[in-house]
Amino acid sequence: MLSELGFPGLLVGFALACEQFVAPSRVLFGQISDAHPLAQRHRVPYVLLGTALFCSLAVLSVPLIFRVGSLLQAGIQPALGLAIAALCGLFGLYGLAISLATTPYLALVIDRTTEAERPRAVGIIWCLLTVGIVIGAVLISTSLRDLDGITDPAVLEPALTAFMLRVALAVFAITVAATWAMEPPALGRRASGVGPREDGVTLAQAWTLIRSSPQVLIFFSFLILFTLALFLQDPVLESYAAQVFGMPIAATAQLNAFWGVGTLLGLLVAGVWVVPSMGKLGAARLGCRLIAASLLMLLLCGLTASVPLLKVVMVLFGLAAGIGTNSALCLMLDLTLPEVAGTFVGVWGLAQALSRALGKVVGGGLLDLGRLLSGSAAGHSPNPFPAYALVLGVEFVVALGALLLLDRVNVHQFREDTGRSLDQVLVAESL
């Protein structure tokens, strides 16, 4: 959209952010999957429905994007405004479909595992997710190689539409295969043997459960700070490597690969060894400390402008992120009730989605503020490092804030509060 079609950066950013703006729907979809089974199943039908919807919307996005591009070139009003609104609306619907697919999926992980099994299950799931992203990126890059250098919309649109259709069909087929026989018919019991799911819990009652324990707000706030500590630097990392370390564009793009390798190792190590040996809270504390230390190293290595050191730090940062992510996800899955697992997963997913969106905005805003304060924006200072140091410094403080909040998380207190509230809800419903 930015290069071939010449879309304004603000338009691209806002359209993509529309996917995050609908994040509150995760709570609703989680509660719906708790209370309303489809085809006698609470999770898999919603996963398949959401997948079918976001695959269809992905295919529809291609002609709409090219339509907006042609109207931008022609400057036709008011058709351009309507097309932009339609594009933003489509990305919003795409976000709804993603929420519909992913929230019941995470609830299914809770339904199908015990507390002891979850660290390893989470590690395997997120490792395979990372591997899948890498394989998908390689396959997409290889498949679109013939389109390199082509900017003619008349050639690009039919080629990309056909390509997206093939990808959508493949994604849906893989999803069907992956979820086949993963959920038994809803007989009112979880696969792990915990008691019946109460289909009568309404959205209002679920909201009562969410507000019943201060631990919900504490962990919600922790997830926001933790996710910000991971991704606040994301929108400025490549420019940090280019301007401070003098790396070429192709090399800066490879930094994500170093981070990804570290994350993969961290997820495996956490799932197999760290979480089982230290416990979920202990592993989460270790992850937060390692993330804070990695951010400090990322800041300090900018003083040396050493590219090899930067690559090592990115691997260490990924390792810390993997350990922290695994333990935080295990905590997230523990801080639920079996009867309303989807609802609580939706709440935690909302925290993560909001913080990812906030990270994109705040990261870029802090960089602009740093440039303004250091004078580099006006050309008064030739040194770009102080502006990036502000971003990384704030991110370091955010990681420490997440660590402090983590000390207040109490899984036992959460279960006691929400369990008592659930009993009251069910008693009131039976009267």
Regions found by a protein language model. Give the residues of each.
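Short amphipathic helix-loop junctions that connect adjacent transmembrane helices
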Residues: 1-11, 235-252
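Loop-to-transmembrane helix entry/capping segments in MFS-fold secondary transporters
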Residues: 9-10, 84, 115-125, 249-250, ...
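Helix-to-loop junctions at the C-terminal end of transmembrane segments
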Residues: 24-40, 266-282
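C-terminal ends and interior cores of transmembrane alpha-helices
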Residues: 48-80, 289-305
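Intracellular loop-helix junctions on the cytosolic face of multi-pass helical membrane proteins
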Residues: 78-89, 96, 100-101, 105-106, ...
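Intracellular juxtamembrane helix-capping segments at the cytosolic ends
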Residues: 100-113, 323-337
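C-terminal transmembrane helical hairpin of 12-TM major facilitator-type secondary transporters
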Residues: 284-328
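A late C-terminal transmembrane helix in Major Facilitator Superfamily
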Residues: 341-372
